Amino acid sequence: MTRIPSSDITDQRFYLNRRAFIASALAAAGASAFVNPELHAQQPAAHGRKLATVKSPLSGSETPNKWEHLTTYNNFYEFGTSKSDPAVNARGFKPREPWTIAIEGECARRGTITLEDVLKGQTLEDRIYRHRCVEGWSMVIPWVGFPLASLIKRCEPTSKAAFVEFTTLLDRRQMPGQESDVLQWPYVEGLRMDEAMHPLTILAVGLYGETLPNQNGAPLRLVVPWKYGFKGIKSIVKVRFLAKQPVSSWQLAWPQAYGFYANVNPAVQHPRHSQAMEARLPSLFQTMRTLPFNGYGDQVASLYAGMDLRRNY
């Protein structure tokens, strides 16, 4: 993983939707630093059950964001579109027990499996990864999880399986954001098979050595550290193996802004803003240059050899 030199960290204004407007106003008044207020608007999540883990050699060495940052500033539209909504609206979410995952499509072992069964004999790993949101902010997150490849191998995909599609739980009673029309529900995401099998790609079940809080995607979510955060689908209930590329939820909603690959790329800007810089939360003023593939290019760039990454964004 590419390290970010201190010379790449700058102290300049960073515009991030309506929250950045507040920051820029303070800067004009002479403020030298600004902490995003939504990071402190809610009580952090209660701590979960401790998990037995081992440190992965693929884990990064950067200092993770604090628990309160990670559990009060979230994109989880099933619980609302504001960053503080999930911390409030997911409090009463009760993941069904047993949590089941439907396995469908081009594989030999179709059916329904429980998360408990998936985790039997599975070594849970601590993985400190960078997290880069398409909105222009970033964090460092200490996930607990296991390689997605281990689940895929268990499903025995056929030679026709070129893609993996994931689906989030549809439960409007518990997930009030699904009453809105901001997206078509349930949320759907996908990966090319080689991306899904890559050692960096994990299914996360925890955070900071504990079970995953509701607002972070409990009980099971996808983590692909070289892609923008919207690829990290949460509360997964279905995995489907496909011969053709699936259409993800954000692709369907706004294809000019959200591509299937969603690799972090400072050279390809979002229609509303540049992707060249990012704000490392909790500060909106601690900004740094965004690295191709979020700094994981040494490990993953070969997956896209010969591809036009401006076109295949």
Where are these regions (language model features)?
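Structured, non-membrane catalytic/scaffold regions adjacent to prosthetic-group chemistry
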Residues: 44-313
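N-terminal secretory signal peptides
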Residues: 1-16, 20, 27-31, 39-42
